[in-house]
UniProtKB/Swiss-Prot annotation:
Species annotation: Rickettsia typhi (strain ATCC VR-144 / Wilmington)
Family listed: Belongs to the RecO family.
Top-level taxonomic group: Bacteria
GO (cellular component) term, any one: bacterial nucleoid
PANTHER family, per the entry: DNA REPAIR PROTEIN RECO
Swiss-Prot/TrEMBL keywords: DNA damage, DNA recombination, DNA repair
Protein name per its UniProtKB record: DNA repair protein RecO
Chain's gene name: recO
GO terms (BP aspect): DNA recombination; double-strand break repair
Function: Involved in DNA repair and RecF pathway recombination.
Amino acid sequence: MNIKDIGVIISKKPLKENTFIIRVFTKNHGLYSGVIKASSKKNKFIYQEGNIVDFLWQARLHEHIGIAKCELIKSYTGYFIINKAKLYAFNSVKFLIQELFHEREEHSIFFAFLINYLDNLSKNFCFRDYINFELNLLAETGYKIDLTKCCVSHVTTDLTYVSPKSARALSYKVGKPYRDKLLILPKFLLSEDSKITLEEKKQALTLTNYFFNRYLFHNNRQVEARKEFIEYITNI
């Protein structure tokens, strides 16, 4: 059987000399793995992590790992490796996708979001964009955090907290009596124009980390690349 799609290479591991297993996050078929041969310099460039490719997968049976062939559409790798913030962000992104998405499970809408994120990241690292990636990833896996209004009073102003139980925002007035049990809602998530402080970065990462740990990182397992990103971005 054959599958043809567009995708982003998110993993490349050696199998034997000049032979690798790549993992590609595709638009219409989700994560797919395949064996490739990359003997020439040109082929090795095509199969770098972060590249957008036309992806062809062939196997006798669907459950087989299959043989993969790719044609390069766009390469982002060079933009990421020259900037630490971009590189750490991309590494976190690719490992989160591998950790949280099931093999061969379609995520076509999220794929479009990812392509837009990578395009923006290639131009400039933006912490707001990264957190929006994590929020979108949580939503895609079924755990959307609703920051549009207070879940009790329904007001849309003075939103200050997030309930760890409902994953919904709370106003300052409603949440104040329970503030020790609530998560802080960073102000920059409510306003595109606000400057992001170091404290707000930590608050935002604490917010998404809580829901990753509660629902998705089983047995408190952490994604090492995400930990490295957090360590870097909160110490610059």
